[in-house]
Amino acid sequence: GSEMCIRDSIETVTLDVIPPVDGSIAACVTDEQKEANAKRLHEEDVIRNKYVGTFYTEEKAEALPKELGIDPLKTADFMIGSRGNWREIEKFLRDAPADKRPMAMDLLNVISAKDLRDTPASVLADHLNNAQAVQSSLFTEYILNPRVANEFLTPYRKFFAANVDSALVKKAKADPQLIVDWVKDNISINDSLNPQRIPIMPMGVWKSRVADKGSRDIFFVAVCRSIGIPARIEPVAGKVQYAKGLNWVDVDFEAAEQTVAKQGKVVASYQPIKALQDPKYY
């Protein structure tokens, strides 16, 4: 064992601390208990499999794209991937106006697998029906996409379209820095009010005008996307950015001016030698 001394102002006590011998603890289970547990596990499997049996299958997914005139392979992927949320995804596709069905498919394609499984049709419909169509290669991922970071998805797009001053929107499309300035002037930062850093919903930030830095960043991107400005939280360095043309501009809410993000290119080259086989990529 090892010795541990505890000292205080009165006395010193020496203890021998001996760890228990490593090993499993034998459990005494009767045959009746084993049988009851096996029965319970079987009942749980029956309940689970009955529920899973209601999910979409490839056969079931064939009818919907024929009815709506949408891509059958992608539709099958979405419906099967949505698991128990298939009713919401089906409702979203059925309710989408015919001229917006291609955009509806793009929206489902850009959200995560988890979002397919737990996002209500009403949230998806808000982002589809209130998205400002912009002719840009960045549109689907950085304007239409409702997902910014790890926030709870909410129907914020119609809200911001109605509440952000129209004069500001018009000017900001030409100069997105105006949205940066608005956020700096109107949103107070108080990280101590959200020690767990659970993202505040963008609409909540608008109403309270207070947020932690992470929620402020999500709010900024959500507002930009709602008014047709491509924006993101860059996934590698976590920088907040908006796009001006096809150039990404870093946002620093503490800086007076924003800087254009530097663009680079990584090239992997290989010179073969006889002593080694060529590398293979998986």
What kind of region is each of these model predictions?
Residues 35, 47-208, 253-255:
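Secondary-structure boundary elements
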Residues 1-6:
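Short, small-residue-biased leader/transition segments that mark boundaries at the very start
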